[in-house]
Structure formats: C-alpha cells, structure tokens
Amino acid sequence: MVRRLTSPRLEFEAAAIYEYPEHLRSFLNDLPTRPGVYLFHGESDTMPLYIGKSINIRSRVLSHLRTPDEAAMLRQSRRISWICTAGEIGALLLEARLIKEQQPLFNKRLRRNRQLCALQLNEKRVDVVYAKEVDFSRAPNLFGLFANRRAALQALQTIADEQKLCYGLLGLEPLSRGRACFRSALKRCAGACCGKESHDDHALRLRQSLERLRVVCWPWKGAVALKEQHPEMTQYHIIQNWLWLGAVNSLKEATTLIRAPAGFDHDGYKILCKPLLSGNYEITELDPVNDQQAS
C-alpha cells in the first residue's frame, strides 16, 4: 500500500475549505493567490460584513477560520468578492478607503480625522494644532498625529517626564514668573524654570525628543505617481499631499484622477510616507501645469 504524503499547507487549505459554510464553497475555489482586497458580504448589497487585504488573497481568506469572531462573521456571509492590486501598497490603500466608505460591521472603524491634531514647535513653545485648520502636508515643525487634543498633550507630558522638561514652560501647567515649578523640587524637572538650565538648552532637548515624531512635509510641488508592479499587473498610484487619489494602469490616465486634495489623510500618510521616501519605487512627478488644469 502506497501512502501519499501531502504538505501541511495543502492539508490546511483542504481542511479550511471543508470547514467553511457550504454556501461559500464556490467562492473559495476561485480565490486568487495575488495581492488585493477581499470583501465578505451578508444580506446587504451596500454594507459588507468585513473588508480585508493581503499579499495573497486566497491564503488570508482561508485563515479566517482561526477565531470564534471570524466564524460568526462567516456564518452571516453570503458571498465573497475581491479586487486584485499590483502589490501590498495598493491593497493597503484600497482597504483603508473602502472601510471608510462602506463601514463594514466586523471592521474596526476608521475615523475621518475630524479632530486630528499634532504638536507644533514654535521657537521654544509647543502648541496643539488641528488638521482642519492647518495643512499638515505643508506646515513645518509638526510632530505626532493624534486623534484629539488630550492624546497630544499626554504624548507631550510623557516626553517631559522622560527628559525632565518643565511642565510650565511647555504650557502643561501654570508657572509663576521667577519661581521654580513643583517638579523641580522633586528633581523631575531639570530647572529651566528657575535658571538651573538655560531656556535654549531646554528648547534643544525638547526638539531632539520630538524629532522621532516629526510629520514629513510633502516633498513635491504637486502630484506624483508611484509605480507598483506584479507579474500580472502594473499600477500607478496617484498621490498628492499624502492623499491617495486612486490608481491607474498607465501614466496617460493620471490626469483623470488629479484634483485638489480634500484635507490631510492620516491613513494615507502612514501607508505612503515610507515607500515614497525609501527610494525603492519608481516615482514620477506629474506636470504641475496639467495638475492645476485637471483639479
């Protein structure tokens, strides 16, 4: 008797298909092994149950059997759809956009950044500024991206505690002129409030501590195209001021997407900053004249 050996991966996939609800079998058979976004749909035609992304759609969809929460979602699912992309960047960007637009029941909600704020360093003072009032893609000396003012001030307080900076000089608490703050007596402040440390040294240490949180200004005049390739697909991601405007199959189609960005996009910044500045992708700066005409 000859015993056939199968790889653990094949056994897992076979088991996964077997465990899925019977009404989803036909969708599983066609799942691609390419990067992209997948959607689990319930009874509603307008609101998906779940939206996810992966560099291998088939593998990721099959893995949804692992937790009870996902099993509950699968029982409510009626069909599965997917959209292939040229790579991980496109999958991340499309997933973030679709979740915001369609608000799936089983996804963590992505907020639209109505209170998005940052710390702005002005000479020796730190202010909390809001994306709805300041263009975060262009404004200098911004540090950190926070959901609200409280989170921003908590981050500043943490830095002050780590570096023994003065709460009073940072605006975190009132400070009487010429008097040391309470934390200075406890040796939790280096004494910039009472002359033990110069204000210049205090400001320098503050800037150095904030540097790891710096928000990078958009380094181009206008929109750019980032080329992402897969053996079966090439996409050009059109981006302006850290906002993903969409993807096209050729640079000739870029002008169909270029428009004036509608505010700073936190998710776009987090996804795009590293790949755009890494030097690992082909970046084409689009004609500013054409950009203005199309926007």
Curated annotation (Swiss-Prot):
It comes from the Bacteria. Residues 33-108 form the GIY-YIG domain. The keyword DNA repair applies. GO terms for biological process: nucleotide-excision repair; SOS response. The keyword Membrane does not apply. Its EC number is 3.1.25.-. GO terms for molecular function: nuclease activity. InterPro entries: GIY-YIG_endonuc, GIY-YIG_endonuc_sf, GIY-YIG_UvrC_Cho, UvrABC_protein_C. Transmembrane segments: none annotated. One of its GO terms (cellular component) is excinuclease repair complex. Keywords: DNA damage, DNA excision, DNA repair, Excision nuclease, Hydrolase, SOS response. Incises the DNA at the 3' side of a lesion during nucleotide excision repair. Incises the DNA farther away from the lesion than UvrC. Not able to incise the 5' site of a lesion. When a lesion remains because UvrC is not able to induce the 3' incision, Cho incises the DNA. Then UvrC makes the 5' incision. The combined action of Cho and UvrC broadens the substrate range of nucleotide excision repair. PANTHER family: EXCINUCLEASE CHO, UVRC/OXIDOREDUCTASE. This is Excinuclease cho. It comes from Escherichia coli O6:H1 (strain CFT073 / ATCC 700928 / UPEC).
